[in-house]
Amino acid sequence: MSKSTLVNVKNLSVRFPVYGGVLSRKVAEVRAVDDISFSIGRSEIVGLVGESGCGKTTVGRAMINILKYVAPDVEVGGNIIYHFDGETVDFAELHPRQVRKYRSRVQMIFQDPYASLNPRMTVQQTVEEPLKIHTELDKGKRKEKVIALLEKVGLRSDQAGRFPHEFSGGQRQRVGIARALATNPDLIICDEPVSALDVSIQAQVINLMMAVSYTHLRAHETEADLVCRLLLE
């Protein structure tokens, strides 16, 4: 293993149980991911490419240990080993609550920008939330950080008080990107971040992602070829 390796995924498998019958017993299982292994180095951009339904989203969610929130009975096998400043942590062995302390180190940008944003929270509140949880910045410093992040992703400071429904799809995804960048994570996992956007907006978002040098991009669009230095199929 290279000293610059950030995460090693070893023999990852994910199975979702299928229940049936009067007593709702397990009658089968769906193999969403079957024995996949790869590694990602620091400052490396990696793309996981495949057709719809092949398990890309499941791999991403497994890597940040949120599958239990989606499906409590899911079975996850293998190892997801992160190397944080000399500390080695296997996310596959941790309860989701135990992962919270590392959540600032690994962030995710979701496919549907509208569904991933709380409609009752302003952009200011959305981007500020991870700063409240994972940093000790006071209110003034947090506000300054939020404004800087919005400007970094191409939004204006006077848009901070608006709600998600007041933005276009591309702008909402920019908010999601700003939120993911807030804690300066070691790894950002992108779940097909442009697939729900118009083609013209896709180019803008991809250019933005290239500008901020993401550690990890995961998509099945061919545009990923333009961004990733390594493609896994």
Kindly give the residue locations of the regions a language model identified.
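ABC ATPase NBD coupling module
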Residues: L23-K26, H83-Q107, I133, K139
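The feature captures the beta-strand-to-loop junction immediately N-terminal to the Walker
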Residues: V49-G50
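Conserved small/polar residues in nucleotide/adenosyl-binding loops
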Residues: C54, T215-T222, L226
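Conserved ABC ATPase "signature" region
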Residues: N79, H83-G86, G140-D158, A211
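Conserved ABC ATPase signature
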Residues: F163-F167, Q171
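Hydrophobic anchor residue at the start of the ABC signature
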Residues: I177, I189, V205, L226
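A short, proline-enriched helix->beta-strand linker immediately N-terminal to the Walker B motif
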Residues: A182-D186, Q202
